[in-house]
From Swiss-Prot:
Gene Ontology molecular function, alphabetical: heme binding; iron ion binding; oxidoreductase activity, acting on paired donors, with incorporation or reduction of molecular oxygen, reduced flavin or flavoprotein as one donor, and incorporation of one atom of oxygen
Protein name according to UniProt: Probable cytochrome P450 515A1
Main location: membrane
UniProt GO BP: organic acid metabolic process; xenobiotic metabolic process
Coiled coil, from the record: none
UniProt-listed InterPro entries: Cyt_P450, Cyt_P450_CS, Cyt_P450_E_grp-I, Cyt_P450_sf
Amino acid sequence: MILGIILGLFIYIYLINIKFFNRAVPSSLLVGENKLKCKFPSGPLILPIIGSLYKLSLKYPHLSFKQLSDKYGKVFSLKMGSIDTIVINDINFLQKSFRDNPTFFSQRFHLPSFYYMGKYQGIIFGNGSHWRKLKDILSSSITKSKSRQMEELFYNEYFKAEEYLLKKINQDNNIDMGPIFKRILLNILYRFLFGVSFEYDDNLLSKEFYSFIQSYNKLFEYLAKQPADFIPILKPFNNYKEIEKEYNNCLNFFQPLIDNILKNISDDDDDGNEPKCFLEYFISEIRKDTSNLIKITDLPYICFDIIVAGIVTTSTTMDWMLLYLTNYPNIQEKLFFEINTPNHPLHKDKLQFPYLNSIIKETLRISPPAPFALPHICTDDIVIDDIFIPKNTQVIPNIYGCNRSNIESSESNVFNPDHFLSKDELNIGQCAFSFGSRQCPGANVADSIMFLVSTKLYKTFKFERTTTQLNDENGHFTRSLSPFEFKSKLIIRK
């Protein structure tokens, strides 16, 4: 009897794998000489209930995707519990999919836990006409608020951080810059959104601020532990209510700021007063929109998405950049030589600093803060480069793998800014902010922040490791791919 059960299980596993991998490509998609080549991508063995989840590391999922890519190809398939999934590990294929075929891939794949973070009314998880209108208004508001005042905002917040650092190094010149980068970004985003900022000295911060940070950390801990998103029989054991609770706690932190702006802003768009912050621009654009798709009540969800995206991507990238510059002091010195100019550069001067730009690009390439992007859904059957992607498939771009796809394997894990100074720069590329209609609308703002802060920070300070051992370049995956905590010694440059 036991032998029969085992045999039956093997037959069942065989049949579900045959059904999954041997999919018939619709005849309407079979054209030209490639009819016989076109197929659904291969992948690891599927098991009942869990699918291919046994192949994924909870600690390093991006590395699991890369290893599976090495075995099954740059585009492979797997079953994430009950969800049919295709993972893209090739930057050229990603461009052909998301950039060249946006109508097939512009929609977000909705995992159940996503609903409890704004009911799909924000910029990150939204879909359809609401999301398209929101993106248009957001992009328009960012464009209108991008000005010399924004650059002054970045510099003002940087100088506050520099003043804090100068005091700090006199007390204990053994500094973890990670929290400081996060505070710089949080202050820039809050000043940008609401016209307010926070102190750098933790002793001067309010209990509401600490409550926000605590809820923010808990929220992403819960999101990282949601097996019920993939395995339906585990739904009774989900903690979606905890996600909703911590998310609402985060919203409560800046709701008073939104209320204050709404109270003080005029209902008359032609009152002649210049908007004082981004949110005033944004509210003005909402009021002008005749479709009424975006509501004032959506503002907390939108603000949360902007703050989280900015902190996770930009501050983490700045932390990684510092790690590499302390590991490779010759690169740091070459950077200093380029940025040691009499004046503070503006964003319009960016092209005059090719080495700094290449360092930022290389940091995003080798250590992308979001090693794999949030999932998309393929909304109709499509064939790209002889690879069949069926309708309703979850599509995950493995940014970590894509950023290594056009570089020789011996060089792909080596930090080398010269990658982006060579004649092959356009062929190398990096896709930290993705491609197509879902490309981060704040990518240019993030780029401005990293450029402007770096031109001042690395001109004022030289950073050294506090030990002879190199800082760990592998990092760990929490809400983002982050470096392990490391400390630096700061030397004021004369």
